[in-house]
Design a protein with these regions (language model features):
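Long, terminal "pre-/pro-" and other extracytoplasmic accessory regions
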Residues: 2-103
Length: 103
């Protein structure tokens, strides 16, 4: 019985750790040298614009602003919002609810 409980605890911790790792995953690290705004600053700006929990984050080339932006998926009140922050100016470029088929 003790082995079964220990196995359940280890499995739960493993699953939780996997979730935390997924939330902290970052795409676009190769573009960081081109940005003037750090990931931490961009995260703070995104959360100030739309408080919640960041579930996905990336740095990408995209039209609008200077062409380089951090994109954050933020879970809030049961919905997912996409918040874009210009990676060179720090300006919030986008703050909208995602549709039924998010990126």
């Amino acid at each position: 019985m003790r082995k079964l409980i220990l196995l359940a605890v280890v499995a739960t911790l493993g699953a939780t750790g996997g979730f935390a790792a997924a939330a902290s995953h970052f795409n676009g690290a190769n573009l960081l040298p081109l940005s003037k705004v750090s990931l931490a600053q961009a995260r703070a700006s995104a959360l100030a614009a739309h408080p919640g929990t960041i579930t996905d984050q990336e740095l990408e080339r995209e039209g609008g602003g200077t062409g380089l932006r951090y994109s954050f998926d933020i879970k809030s009140k049961g919905k997912t919002f996409e918040v874009g922050v210009d990676a060179r100016t720090g300006k919030v470029l986008e703050n909208k609810a995602e549709g039924p088929h998010p990126d």
